[in-house]
């Protein structure tokens, strides 16, 4: 039975039983705590937790899942895969243990003619949690399993959770006995190769807390209702029904292995374990890579992008180790498409993009591999020569940091070479580099010589931010710092560098730079007896995420620790910043509406009148896409959507659909910004407008690449957008006036002028080349003879480029016949004594036979014009810095020819 048929039967079985079929979610979700979807129930978590009401009582799906913790084990055994399909049925307070067991047993054992899988009931076993007598009794009652085929296991095996806080519960697993060829008798507790787990029925009834292993977490209490979450391994059922020993022999992975075998000189399953591992790595990782790219992941250096990059690079290197020297990744992606396309149409519809991204990574990594492999061989040789078998952490770090060689690849190659790597030393050097980078960034940003100076204030409690409600606040000075050192008082004229003076207040309306929004500017003024004190706030930064540091320029009076002050944010600046920040949310929403949910935020910057938004995307946007994004954004602005901000528990906010940045750490309670209901909802601590119309027009300036798989959109907002459009309108009017055409005809007229200019430039180039050729004829005719050598040594016009000189010496040399001949040309610069002097020397074969090689003769030219040069015996070139020495250079050349020739 083919895999697509196994999938179809599963879904049909549960739909017939009243379940709603739900499509697979993407393997990436807007959850910063989850790298990839790793279970079928992930998209249903809000229903299990009672945070949202499910639109159906029961559901069924086949979820794409990715698990990469065991990536290094893939291929070594046939049990590990990074991608798998989890077929599941789910009940949200409807049926419980009996229903789950009855439905699973029926599908597994019903005949093929009746829509089942037709498995032999005598080969099926079940496990239950230690004290789950109810489940054990149901297996005996519903399935007729004898007691010796129902085994009890502890939390590590039969109590399920996602590995993070969330729903959990006891489980019951179904196993298939593959027979004595795969191991001894005794059931799953004895051998899980012979007894293969195919289905896990989770009785989801509790919520778990934090913990690092499968057994050390706390059960927080019962869920609002009892639920069912099951997961059947589609690939495992396929290997049973297809009668093959492992998943790599099934119809989804075997075609990839066959493709590789057709390209590799050594076949699969020929008794070479190392080669078989490489075949399996290619098969598994190619499939996972295609799925990831289809769901919007691009190769990168961290997070999901790094996992994809690592998968593709393991594929490429495994192919190299199989002696496949030609590009193969494109063919692999096509094979995955053909095998998986019937189940996942996006692999076919998005085939060109998937192929383009994967092949680009192959091309880039082949360059790294070529240079890095040579360097590793040198390191390995030096390691052995020193009498040790451990590649130093320093060498591994150099390979990684200087030459881009991944540590995982160094580890693999070292193992293959019989060496190990000081991975601890490598990690420490990486940590040191990160610490240096953070310290450098902090020094550049904060100019804090010693953060311990602020510790007392940090420990005393956070700064109260009042800026969401007011722009002016009364406050008290908690601390004054000059050049990072705490002082009791600071006065006008005491410090000339505004960035060296910092005031810490107990409360402030000035926004500290964070979340992409730059800091407010404003003033801090004294009160009472200190009313003459005034400081301009030029920047506000945070220390330890809780303490606001106001960088100031003291303009008058003095500030004393403990004094009362009035802090005020510049209203115009704040308005512009909020327009920019709200505009960023609008552009983000428009991007996802036009490009799809894979356009995930990677960074942003908002300042008055301007926004910059970085997002994960492969390849440039089309003009049509840019136009659509701009139009969707401005339509939302004109719709005058209400902007709501509120605080919510993190899990509830995510369940509402609030977007979070992957890799960002959030507190339990977060601030949510909602614009226009479902149009935009994000976790955000920034300041925002009250309604979307207050943003004003948004004009996208451009879109560009800022790294592999990351694009950047820049835009003007509000009045700056209007001013930009006004400038463009004036520019267009000026062009129309100069060209004497209506504005709408300017593009066509400019295009026409450009074509005419190109034609004129071509004509000029033809004339110049004709002049060069004529110069060659004239120069050859005027050749002088020194001994047996014919010599053309001339000073040429300043219009001659180095390329012209090379062409010319070749032409002249060809016209001088077979006698010994040398040509030396120097272009006289037009810019005076400070100009560069280019020169070229050519020598024919006969001259070289006399010892007059161009690479030697050029040294005599170079010395006289304070230059350098080099090349081969037939042609050499260089440049000097001393135009006054041109005549002497040519004479020096003549003297050398006279001496030798």
UniProtKB/Swiss-Prot annotation:
EC number: 6.1.1.7
Residue ranges of the TM segments: none
Cofactor: Zn(2+)
Positions that bind Zn(2+): 581, 585, 684, 688
Catalytic activity, as annotated: tRNA(Ala) + L-alanine + ATP = L-alanyl-tRNA(Ala) + AMP + diphosphate
GO molecular function: alanine-tRNA ligase activity; aminoacyl-tRNA deacylase activity; ATP binding; tRNA binding; zinc ion binding
Cited InterPro entries: aa-tRNA-synth_II/BPL/LPL, Ala-tRNA-lgiase_IIc, Ala-tRNA-ligase_IIc_anticod-bd, Ala-tRNA-synth_IIc_core, Ala-tRNA-synth_IIc_N, Ala-tRNA_ligase, Ala_tRNA_ligase_euk/bac, DHHA1_dom
GO biological process, one term: alanyl-tRNA aminoacylation
Localization of this protein: Cytoplasm
Function comment: Catalyzes the attachment of alanine to tRNA(Ala) in a two-step reaction: alanine is first activated by ATP to form Ala-AMP and then transferred to the acceptor end of tRNA(Ala). Also edits incorrectly charged Ser-tRNA(Ala) and Gly-tRNA(Ala) via its editing domain.
Protein name as catalogued: Alanine--tRNA ligase
Gene source species: Mycobacterium ulcerans (strain Agy99)
UniProt gene name: alaS
């Amino acid at each position: 039975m083919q895999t697509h048929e196994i999938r179809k039967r599963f879904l049909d079985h549960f739909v017939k039983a009243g379940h709603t079929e739900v499509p697979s979610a993407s393997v990436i979700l807007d959850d910063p705590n989850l790298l990839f979807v790793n279970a079928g129930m992930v998209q249903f978590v809000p229903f299990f937790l009672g945070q949202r009401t499910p639109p159906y009582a029961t559901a069924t799906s086949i979820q794409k899942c990715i698990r990469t913790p065991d990536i290094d084990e893939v291929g070594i055994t046939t049990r590990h895969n990074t991608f798998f399909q989890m077929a599941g049925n789910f009940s949200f307070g409807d049926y419980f243990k009996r229903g789950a067991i009855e439905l699973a047993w029926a599908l597994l054992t019903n005949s093929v003619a009746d829509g089942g899988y037709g498995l032999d009931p005598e080969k099926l076993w079940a496990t239950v949690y230690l004290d789950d007598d109810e489940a054990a009794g149901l297996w005996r009652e519903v399935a007729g399993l004898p007691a010796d085929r129902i085994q009890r296991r502890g939390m590590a095996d039969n109590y399920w959770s996602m590995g993070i806080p969330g729903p959990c519960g006891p489980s019951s697993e179904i196993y298939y006995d593959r027979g004595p060829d795969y191991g001894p008798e005794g059931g799953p507790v004895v051998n899980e190769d012979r007894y293969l787990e195919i289905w896990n029925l989770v009785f989801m009834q509790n919520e778990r807390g934090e913990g690092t292993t499968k057994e050390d977490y706390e059960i927080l209490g019962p869920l609002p209702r009892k639920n069912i979450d099951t997961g059947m391994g589609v690939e495992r059922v396929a290997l049973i029904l297809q009668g093959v020993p492992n998943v790599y022999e099934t119809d989804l992975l075997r075609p990839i292995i066959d493709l590789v075998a057709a390209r590799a000189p050594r076949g699969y399953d020929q008794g070479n374990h190392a080669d078989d591992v490489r075949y399996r790595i290619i098969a598994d990782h190619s499939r996972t890579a295609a799925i990831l790219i289809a769901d919007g992941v691009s190769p990168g250096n961290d997070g999901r992008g790094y996992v994809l990059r690592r998968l593709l690079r393991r594929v490429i290197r495994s192919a190299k180790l199989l002696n496949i020297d030609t590009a193969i990744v494109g063919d692999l992606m096509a094979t995955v498409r053909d095998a998986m396309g019937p189940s996942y149409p996006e692999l076919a519809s998005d085939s060109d993009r998937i192929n383009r991204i994967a092949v680009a990574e192959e091309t880039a990594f082949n360059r790294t591999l070529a240079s890095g492999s040579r360097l590793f061989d040198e390191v390995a040789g030096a390691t052995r020569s020193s009498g040790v078998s451990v590649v130093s952490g320093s060498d591994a770090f150099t390979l990684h940091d200087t030459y881009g060689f991944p540590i995982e690849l160094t580890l693999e190659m070292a193992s293959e070479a019989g060496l190990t790597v000081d991975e601890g030393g490598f990690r420490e050097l990486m940590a040191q580099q990160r610490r240096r980078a953070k310290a450098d960034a902090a020094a550049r940003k904060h100019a804090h010589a010693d953060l311990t100076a602020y510790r007392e204030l940090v420990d005393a409690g956070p700064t109260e931010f009042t800026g969401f409600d007011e722009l002016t606040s009364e406050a008290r000075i908690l601390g004054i710092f000059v050049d990072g050192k705490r002082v009791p008082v600071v006065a006008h004229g005491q410090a000339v560098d505004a960035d060296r003076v910092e005031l810490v207040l107990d409360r402030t309306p000035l926004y500290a730079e964070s979340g992409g929004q730059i800091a407010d500017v404003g003033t801090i003024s004294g009160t009472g007896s200190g009313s003459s004190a005034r400081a301009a706030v030029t920047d506000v930064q945070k220390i330890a995420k809780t303490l606001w540091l106001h960088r100031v320029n003291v303009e008058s009076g003095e500030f004393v620790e403990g004094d009362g002050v009035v802090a005020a944010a510049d209203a115009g600046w704040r308005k512009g910043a909020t327009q920019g920040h709200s505009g960023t949310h609008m552009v983000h929403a428009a991007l996802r509406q036009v490009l799809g949910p894979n356009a995930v935020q990677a960074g942003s910057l908002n300042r008055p009148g301007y926004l910059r938004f970085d997002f994960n995307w492969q390849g440039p946007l089309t003009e049509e896409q840019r136009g659509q994004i701009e139009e969707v954004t401005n339509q939302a602005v004109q719709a005058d959507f209400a902007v709501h901000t509120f605080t919510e528990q993190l899990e509830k906010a995510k369940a509402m659909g609030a977007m979070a940045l992957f890799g960002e750490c959030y507190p339990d309670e977060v601030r949510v910004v909602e614009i226009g209901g479902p149009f935009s909802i994000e976790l955000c601590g920034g300041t925002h407008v009250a309604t979307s119309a207050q943003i004003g027009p948004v004009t996208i300036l451009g879109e560009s690449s800022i790294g592999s798989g990351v694009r950047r959109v820049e835009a003007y907002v509000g009045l700056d957008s209007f001013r930009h459009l006004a400038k463009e309108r004036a520019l267009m009017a000026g062009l129309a006036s100069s060209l004497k055409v209506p504005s709408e005809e300017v593009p066509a007229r400019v295009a026409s002028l450009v074509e005419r200019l190109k034609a004129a430039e071509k004509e000029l180039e033809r004339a110049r080349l004709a002049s060069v050729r004529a110069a060659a004829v004239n120069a050859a005719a005027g050749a002088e003879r020194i001994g047996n050598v014919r010599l053309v040594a001339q000073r040429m016009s300043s219009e001659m480029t180095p390329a012209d000189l090379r062409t010319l010496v070749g032409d002249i040399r060809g016209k001088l016949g077979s006698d010994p001949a040398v040509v030396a040309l120097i272009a006289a610069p037009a810019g005076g004594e400070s100009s560069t002097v280019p020169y070229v020397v050519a020598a024919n074969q006969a001259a070289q036979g006399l010892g007059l090689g161009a690479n030697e003769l050029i040294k005599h030219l170079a010395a006289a014009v304070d230059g350098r040069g080099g090349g081969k015996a037939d042609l050499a070139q260089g440049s000097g810095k001393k135009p006054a020495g041109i005549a002497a250079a040519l004479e020096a050349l003549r003297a050398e020819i006279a001496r030798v020739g």
